[in-house]
Amino acid sequence: MKIVRAALLATCFAAPELAAAQTLQGLPPGPLGQAIQRGHDMMMNSSGSTEAKPYVGNALNCSSCHINAGDTSTPGNFRETASKFPAYSKREGAVITLEDRIANCFMRSMNGMRPSTDSSVVVDMAAYINWLDKGQPIATPPAPSNPSPYPAMLKAATPADVTAGQTVFTANCAACHGTDGAGLGSFPPLWGPKSFNAGAGLANIAKLATWVKGNMPLGNPHLTPQQAFQVALYINTRPRPDFVLSQHLAPGHDYNASVHAETDTVASNLQKAGLSLQSLTGGP
């Protein structure tokens, strides 16, 4: 059993490096195809890319959340993403483009500086996402047929859910992400200074629960909705970097938003749901 487990982990550890070297098939010839390939490669190895690294402030890659550079059918995929933009963003209070969304991810999920939307990094990633969308209809996607159970679970969350989430984490996540959530090998940190900040999309517990339910454990997602929620609650009550918008915008930035002041913390994210970090964890 230990031999099989070790072999499985070795395969998983090697997978990101193998995928990063993948040559995409069916690309258009010339500069556009080259841009698409670069966009894919930067997503697979953002923190190791010469072009993307200056905008990355943690130990994550885009593929840490967008598995296989988003070329999957699970939550976090990029299929049919380009056709959803331009779109109104409540967070920014503005109609934003795909390029805006990519640039904003760098300062939130990657905890780095926001690149300009006309930078080669953003343009190449947008080219890749658009290529994945080839042949897809340009239309507003239908609303989910079944409402998410997680907002209601969040409103009713108790310290017992945090404790249960730690148990789920230990049994299903710690082998790859470490008991301290700092990540092991090529598996990313889930909290702490090298993970996504409190302004990231996955800092939203309901969104993280949806992502976990569809993707984790890697290669064998099998958690119940309650387990996915509890482990998401546990992860998002751990320490992570605060998000202060002004600290992620370079002079002369092209941030497309009507909201120009934003600060998010682990505690403030819970307060938005009517919860107290201290009550849930006994911490400060």
Name the predicted role of every residue range:
Residues 49-52, 69-75, 132-137, 238-245:
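Secretory-pathway/luminal and periplasmic proteins that interact with or process carbohydrate-rich
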Residues 57-60, 64, 120, 124-127, ...:
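Amphipathic alpha-helical interaction segments
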Residues 1-48, 87-162, 238, 272-284:
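Post-cleavage N-terminal segment of exported redox proteins
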Residues 98-99, 133-144, 175-183, 201-208:
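A structural motif
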Residues 239-284:
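A cross-kingdom marker for long, charged
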Residues 31-69, 149-187, 205-206:
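Sequence/structural segment immediately N-terminal to covalent heme-attachment motifs in c-type
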Residues 49-55, 113-118, 138-142, 220-226, ...:
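Surface-exposed patches in mature extracellular/periplasmic domains of secreted proteins
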Residues 33-38, 42-44, 71-115, 125, ...:
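Extracytoplasmic electron-transfer domains, predominantly the class I c-type cytochrome c fold
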